Amino acid sequence: IRPPSKEKIRDRVLNLDEIKNIWAACDQMGYPWGPIFQLLMLTGARLREVSQASWSEVSIADGTFDLPASRTKNKRSHQIQLSDQAQNIIQTLPRIEGQTLLFTTNGTTAVSGFSKVKKRLDIISGVTGWRFHDLRRSFATHSTERLGISPVIADKILNHVTGQVRGVA
């Protein structure tokens, strides 16, 4: 019996042109997919953290997105400061009375079917060979390398426990 192979650590970081093309494709895709992926790029949050977000977790007045411990990978509550651009995206989302989720196609459950949507996004954007989690890694890399944010702060933004930006989980 062979031992299990080591899991390959992904290190794909999207360059700025790729991010720009994905952003433009998101504009074409519209609700719910476009805004989900744009918020991933702006916040560095995990796909499920954004796609399953509820209105009660977001405060435009405070500019925050409060994730309860039950919805984070490390089971620690996390507050994400929303940029003006992220707040504007959230403010433009359809708001239906009685609907608790930011992103839903049926009014009651969070969106699903990401692999199908990812294929569509690849076609529209012309960017291939990446995964949704690469948006998070790209956020971390560009924050530290281009914006000069300290890796310790980047880890806090990403709700990391370890203090390592590499191998973004």
What name fits each language-model region?
Residues 28-32, 95, 127, 146-149:
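Alpha-helical structural elements of signaling/regulatory helical domains
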Residues 4-7, 13, 67-75, 87, ...:
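Catalytic-site neighborhood detector that most strongly recognizes the C-terminal catalytic loop/helix
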Residues 13-19, 62, 71, 81-128, ...:
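Active-site/catalytic core of tyrosine-dependent DNA strand-transfer enzymes
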Residues 1-53, 61, 72-76, 96-97, ...:
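Basic, Lys/Arg- and aromatic-enriched nucleic-acid-binding interface segment
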Residues 38, 42-49, 120, 134-163:
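C-terminal catalytic core of tyrosine-transesterase DNA break-rejoin enzymes
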Residues 57-64, 128-129, 148-169:
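Short, polar N-cap/turn motifs at the start of nucleic acid-interacting alpha helices
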